[in-house]
From Swiss-Prot:
PROSITE patterns: RADICAL_SAM. Pathway: Cofactor biosynthesis; biotin biosynthesis; biotin from 7,8-diaminononanoate: step 2/2. Transmembrane segments: none annotated. [4Fe-4S] cluster binds at residues 67, 71, 74. Its cofactor is [4Fe-4S] cluster; [2Fe-2S] cluster. One of its GO terms (molecular function) is iron ion binding. Belongs to the radical SAM superfamily. Biotin synthase family. SMART domains: BATS (SM00876), Elp3 (SM00729). The lineage of its organism: Bacteria, Pseudomonadati, Thermodesulfobacteriota, Desulfovibrionia, Desulfovibrionales. It comes from Maridesulfovibrio salexigens (strain ATCC 14822 / DSM 2638 / NCIMB 8403 / VKM B-1763) (Desulfovibrio salexigens). It catalyses: (4R,5S)-dethiobiotin + (sulfur carrier)-SH + 2 reduced [2Fe-2S]-[ferredoxin] + 2 S-adenosyl-L-methionine = (sulfur carrier)-H + biotin + 2 5'-deoxyadenosine + 2 L-methionine + 2 oxidized [2Fe-2S]-[ferredoxin]. [2Fe-2S] cluster binds at residues 112, 143, 203, 273. It holds the Pfam family BATS. Keywords: 2Fe-2S, 4Fe-4S, Biotin biosynthesis, Iron, Iron-sulfur, Metal-binding, S-adenosyl-L-methionine, Transferase. This is Biotin synthase.
Length: 327
């Protein structure tokens, strides 16, 4: 980064605004010697907006596998054979509520019900709504990730007690055709907009390390800023055997930290949440909170095991951070 780029970075931090596209690209291209200053800028922005509270979330995979979509990273796609993902139908109402009961033993702000497939519809959607409607007084907020739902379905979901809807853009619009061909980027954007119109908070981010350029990572960050999403979950590719991306080399720890910082600096008012792939940070996992994260997904992911929540709670305590609970 040159002097003007660093000045633009700090002007944004001290002014309470976001960095521009040029500065965002320069952040991703920063040298290792500039890492500390960039993390300091991102951390300062996070502390001013969110303080020392961290939002924890977890998910339940309530329908797995046999997905009609061809997302190149996903073990649940029916297009790819030999992946390790389990396949099972939608859980019963009682099974979904059992998942929520177990989740309530941890200090979560959000717990999300996730299903494979393009979109959950009809009686299946009613089934999830019934399960959630009977659990309004839980210690956490209900979240759902049920695919490309239309406005009426999202409204029904909100009326059942769901507070937040998760629906990633996955990648920049210019790179999306390399990620999925069975539905469009525009469909994903429309779902996000409809969720907001239905009164839901929106958790919307993407998956990094798919082969996209630095410019395309910035493109995704700017798209999320334009959509004014509430939470940005950042996932970093875990190459899964049997998928087209099984041989892609994961991002290195310092590149992951710079990527987190860039998303924070472009989105000063949104939660930035570390989701899948943080094992790639190895010994630097706690650095995510210096890079701009104020949210963390805990427990297992959709098709990959995570680490125990006790380990994460100890990490937060060691960092002097506190857990934010249901509003």
């Amino acid at each position: 980064m040159d002097r003007n780029e660093k000045q633009a970075l700090w002007n944004a931090v001290h002014g309470g605004g976001a960095i521009d596209e040029h500065t965002a690209v320069s952040v991703l291209g920063a040298s290792h010697g500039e890492l500390a200053e960039i993390l300091h800028a991102a951390h300062t922005m996070t502390m001013r907006r969110f303080g020392r509270e961290v939002s924890l979330c977890s998910i339940a995979n309530v329908r797995s596998g046999n997905c009609s979509e061809d997302c190149t990273f996903c073990a649940q796609s029916s297009h790819f054979k030999g992946t390790p993902a389990p396949a099972y139908p939608l859980m019963s109402v009682e099974e979904i509520r059992d998942c929520a009961e177990k989740a309530g033993q941890s200090p979560l702000e959000f717990f999300s019900y996730v299903t494979s497939g393009r979109a959950l519809k009809g009686k299946s959607l009613d089934h999830v709504c019934e399960a959630v409607d009977g659990m309004r007084e839980r210690s956490f907020n209900h979240c759902a990730s049920l695919g490309c739902l239309d406005f009426e379905s999202l409204k029904k979901l909100h009326e059942s007690g769901v507070v937040r809807y998760h629906h990633n853009l996955e990648a920049a619009e210019s790179y999306f055709p390399n990620v999925c061909t069975t539905h469009s980027y525009e469909e994903r954007v429309r779902t996000v907009r409809d969720a907001k119109k239905a009164g839901l908070e929106v958790c919307c981010g993407g998956l990094l390390g798919l082969g996209e350029s630095h410019q395309q990572r910035v493109e995704l960050a700017l798209a999320l800023a334009e959509l004014e999403v509430d939470s940005i979950p950042l996932n970093f590719l875990i190459p899964i055997p049997g998928t087209p991306l099984e041989n892609v080399e994961p991002l290195q720890p310092l590149e992951i930290l710079l990527t987190i910082a860039m998303f924070r600096l472009v989105n000063p008012h949104a939660e930035v949440r570390m989701a899948a792939g943080r094992a790639a940070l190895r010994s630097l996992q706690s650095f995510i909170f210096h890079a701009g994260c104020n949210g963390l997904m805990v427990g297992d992911f959709l098709t990959v095991s995570g680490q125990g929540i006790d380990h994460d709670l100890t990490m937060l305590e060691d960092l002097g951070l506190t857990v934010r609970t249901k509003k």
